[in-house]
Amino acid sequence: MNNITSPRTDDQGIEQEIQDKGLTAPRITPADIQANIANVFYFTAKQGAEMAAKEAGSNKAGEPSEGIALGLLTFCVLVLKNGFTVTGESACASPENFDAEIGRKIARENATQKIWPLMGYELKSKLKG
């Protein structure tokens, strides 16, 4: 059996491939993306619903069965250095598989992916001058 290593398609793997090929034109790097994140917030939809109910003067955040479903949806809010926000989410279909840490990782990655086009647009505008 052939052991063929497939190329990495994650952000760091792609950046390494760019460097290996000697490409040096201006670009956004994974480090640029991370450096642009000023703050990170995580919460579940259940926590959001409970806070919204509390602020509305109610102690009910929906039916108990909804609480289980809402607890499986994790949000990540990234505040960028300029104050702009991007969000990511992670939904778990099965309560038995829910893991808060994994949910936060997936939600953050999904939010981080939204920064690329924003910073790419900004770079292109600067290059166009």
Where are the regions a protein language model picked out?
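Domain-level marker for long, solvent-exposed, non-transmembrane regions
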Residues: 1-129
